Swiss-Prot record:
The lineage of its organism: Bacteria, Bacillati, Bacillota, Bacilli, Bacillales. This is UPF0295 protein GK0479. GO terms for cellular component: plasma membrane. It holds the Pfam family DUF2614. Belongs to the UPF0295 family. The chain crosses the membrane at residues 12-32, 42-62. It is a multi-pass membrane protein. Keywords: Cell membrane, Membrane, Transmembrane, Transmembrane helix. It comes from the Bacteria. It is found in: Cell membrane. Disulfide bonds: none annotated.
Amino acid sequence: MSIKYSSKINKIRTFALSLIFIGVIVMYLGLFFRTSPVIMTLFMLFGMLFLVASGIVYFWIGTLSTRAVQVVCPSCGKVTKMLGRVDLCMFCREPLTLDRELEGKEFDEKYNKKRKS
């Protein structure tokens, strides 16, 4: 069974989207406690915290995306953004690297870890 990889930007965007859904579900669960205003308010506040956290993550990935290196994918020919030493094309999932040492090697996300000096 092979590992399913995704580009880093898409992973972070998916995480932010999941925070939105979690926040809405938590707030919806709060409606079941309408008889207890304190518990309902706590659920609504926790749900709102998830939504605010999602907004912060979206803002962060937006600023990170503006600084990402844009490259043309050799496989599909579309412009994609790279974060780190290795990443995948957002469109066709072709492994990409800007590091000459890693060209031709099997794709592994561990290449993005900080090197020990």
